[in-house]
Amino acid sequence: RPGGSVQTINNALARGQNLLLTPGVYAIDRTIEVKRPDTVVLGMGHATLTSVGGAVPMAVADVPGVVIAGVTFDAGTQLSPALLRVGTAHANHGIAARRSVTDPTTLSDVFVRVGGPHVGKVTNAVEVNSDHVIIDDAWIWRADHGIEGFTNGVNGDTDRWNTNTGLNGLVVNGDDVTATGLFSEHFQHFSTLWNGNGGTVVMYQNELAYDPPTQADWTQPNGTLGYPGYKVADGVTSHHLYGGGVYAFNENNPSIHTASGFEVPDTPGVLLHHVFTICLSGPGTIDHVVNDTGGTAGAATVSQRQVVVDYP
């Protein structure tokens, strides 16, 4: 329950106990470490783990069978590198990866919030490094509105852009990761960045950031206009997305352009099915749907979906 120490929680987890989080907001000043296979972490009533002092609220080791369900992860006022981390980056997963084929780690009904009720700061909101992880219903949200008291810009958006910082929403480095019902929104770089091979996503929803003050703020270092709502890294050779939408609503600067809603490598093993972009209510433009393919979603096509049935 709220008020319990992370050390007490970690001691119990190390003894092989599962973790039940009762309703409430937990101030987490060090990482809850899930290290044993087949551990269950279950939140009730939107139990919320709020980072304190830049802590990563929860980290899962490279072990099979862990279940994280019904938990909300909340960024704090000091920058966290992540809010939920699964597995070790750049690790040789070895035996753990082989076991996880039949006993995968699962993230179910997981919610992530950066800003809204208070200032929030994170680099990568959710980082998945283990192989074969299943993500079943996740909403990863950098706040497009809140009660922080911001005033500069439309609805305080310029203050929000400079204060509620969140670079990337979901970063997947593991192989053979599957997501069903994935929502990731409003991040300042990539809302979803998929670096691993063999990924599969069924139903993806994204709204691009509402709040970039200028096009320069919303331009990649290589000069590409904006950041796609769904990015598969250039070195990936196998990936499937079934059903995805990326929306633009650049209320803070209607002249903002985003080059494409989805950006993927042109290779035979990377396939997208039934994806679209759309401009909501007018402000902002997405020039193409996937890479350089598909129509423009902008002021001339407000509320009209620009659809690519299959890519390539």
Predicted regions and their residues:
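Extracellular/periplasmic carbohydrate-active domains that bind, remodel
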Residues: 1-312
